[in-house]
Amino acid sequence: GGTSGPGAPSEPGETPGETRVDSAGNITAAPELNDSGIAVTEIDDETLATALANAKETDGKKTVEITIPAIEGAKAYEISLPASALTSSAGDTRFVIKTDMAVVTLPGNMLAQEAAAKAKKVSLSITLVDVSQIEDEELRQLIGRRPIIQLSLRIDGEDFPWNNPDSPVRVAIPYTPTEEELANPEHITVWHIDRDAKVTPVPNGRYDEETGTVTFSITHFSWFAVVYVHKTFGDLAGVGWARKPIEVMASKGIIQGTGPDTFSPASNITRADYTVLLIRTLGLRAEFTDNFDDVKEDAYYYEAVGIAKKLGIALGDGDNRFNPEEPISRQDLMTLSARVLDKYMGLKLSDDIHVLDRFIDKGDIAEYALSGIATLVKEGLIVGSDSRISPLANTTRAEAAVFLYRVYNSYVK
């Protein structure tokens, strides 16, 4: 595998424990190395207040960068902040913690919950994990020399199992890919590894060539490993146009095959299966208490459909039925997708349906689907085939994979 690259260099003249704030509200905090090999730094109330007063707004949020210069021999960095920094209910601040192991962006409302209400101090630890700490030999081989980091949080000295679906934390790990990986950078991704060495893909994990980092967003802390996964299937010969999207989306853990070596690209995708993939692709979350009458609680798609219903993107047939096992038509797939992208991902629905004039079967599109389909065509997410949009046709698994691959690359950052 590749190696981790450089991060925040130490500057000459840094005094351990010294903290500076510049005119833009950015903090440089030189750490002190303790006896355990942890580089420790603390930001006090006064420093934080000065930084927030000077900080500039971007995207409606005040951003404070906290750079911790690298210190030789450090196996972890621990930064402590006043708890007030991360318990804002407004969510209009963020703190970018920059170390040579990882850059971690903490939203100011990540702890806006009961547990942290009386807290005084919050400490974030970023630890570089040695692969030898993983007992599973196969997993060790798969990760190789790629970086593994552990993120953890303590509140007033006590370990805190942070988990907040409403306030994702953004992570960027410096990484230098191998030649093989650079030839297929979309297959560089991220795995979450739990205490039992069970692996869960982090679907939004990807390599950013511009910054030379592997980036991902998470809603809980644990171990996270950079990995290179090239999943393929034995039945893709007839769908060359869909091979790359299928392989990339499968490698990221977003889509699965119908068997260990089969994808069944020409099979129709059901309404339930498509909803699962859409929710997983976009990483959408919601607490819900009710579901459609025909979605059973033990169904594998129960959670995804419940989330889609709660978020107002799966509307059913008006009789509180979703018809989960029915194939999804192309126009219903496009309508559902346009609705979610408009409501949650910043796409603006367009009323200009002239863009559909290029399709000879435009007249087959149902009234309710016109705006959504026109918007997706305008955005280049749907291109049609042979001057047809085929709104009434069922959607194949290959078509769904290609569409979601385009959505992923346009909207998942």
Predicted segments — roles?
Residues 204-206, 218-243, 251, 255-304, ...:
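Feature responds to low-complexity, polar/acidic, surface-exposed segments characteristic
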Residues 1-43, 52:
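Ser/Thr/Gly/Pro-rich low-complexity, disordered linker/stalk segments of secreted
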Residues 1-6, 15, 25-29, 142-252:
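Proteolytic cleavage junctions
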Residues 66-68, 190, 249, 253, ...:
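Terminal processing/anchoring signals of secreted or surface-associated proteins
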Residues 34-194:
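Proteolytic processing hotspots in large secreted/extracellular or virion-associated proteins
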Residues 61-63, 76, 92-94, 168, ...:
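A generic structural signal for beta-strand entry/edge sites
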